[in-house]
Amino acid sequence: MLEGVIRESITKANAKALKKDGYLIANVYGKGVENVSCAFKLNPFIKYLKEKKHLIFPVKLGDKTFEVVVQEYQKNPVTNELIHVDLLAVTKGVKSKFKVPVKYQGTPVGLKNKGILMLSKKRISVECAPEHLPNHYLVDVAPLDVNESILVRDLEKHENVKILDHDSIAVIGVIKAK
């Protein structure tokens, strides 16, 4: 389980001092949950996120434990280092909006015909209760030829999960190389 510290002071000087000590500044918020300003050790946080199996994961802040999902993050545009992360605390049975990653498998037929695979949408916006949240959408790209794409409406439908993105948006496709 990922452990963090609750920030008592939310001043700019305090945030700078924490960053200098190797901490990542974060906020935990959600429906029915009081906002918590906190900080996590940067390297263990990144390692934990890479190894986790589910979108929802537990964090411990002080004596409280929250089930959270990464809602948004900010990176330094030059160094590409994480600066800040927003964590949405989820409550069982309460619908929330999430962004679910798209993963693809296979090698498109169109790559042999001088095509390039274009991942247009890396995440799909959905609304559901946390217990129905899919970990990812898996797309088989093997049958795709040049100028073909998979749209949001072609994705696998999950029960009790409402996709918020428009049906005609391309998720992944093969375009002709110039």
Swiss-Prot record:
**InterPro entries in the record:** Rbsml_bL25/Gln-tRNA_synth_N (IPR020056), Ribosomal_bL25/Gln-tRNA_synth (IPR011035), Ribosomal_bL25_b-dom (IPR020057), Ribosomal_bL25_C (IPR037121), Ribosomal_bL25_long (IPR001021), Ribosomal_L25_dom (IPR029751), Ribosomal_uL5_bac-type (IPR020930)
Instruction: Tell me the keywords, alphabetical order.
Output: Ribonucleoprotein, Ribosomal protein, RNA-binding, rRNA-binding
Q: GO CC annotation: what is one? A: cytosolic large ribosomal subunit
Is Phosphoprotein among the key words of this record?
no
Can you name this protein?
Large ribosomal subunit protein bL25
SUPFAM superfamilies in alphabetical order: Ribosomal protein L25-like
Gene3D superfamilies referenced in this protein's UniProt entry, alphabetically? Ribosomal protein L25, beta domain (2.170.120.20), Ribosomal Protein L25, Chain P (2.40.240.10)
Recorded hits in Pfam families, A to Z, give: Ribosomal_L25p, Ribosomal_TL5_C
Recorded hits in NCBIfam families, A to Z, give: bL25_bact_ctc, PRK05618.1-4
Q: Set out the biological process GO terms recorded for this chain's protein.
A: translation
**Which family, according to the similarity comment?**
Belongs to the bacterial ribosomal protein bL25 family. CTC subfamily.
Q: What does this protein do?
A: This is one of the proteins that binds to the 5S RNA in the ribosome where it forms part of the central protuberance.
What organism does the UniProt record list as the source?
A: Helicobacter acinonychis (strain Sheeba)
Quote one Gene Ontology molecular function term: structural constituent of ribosome
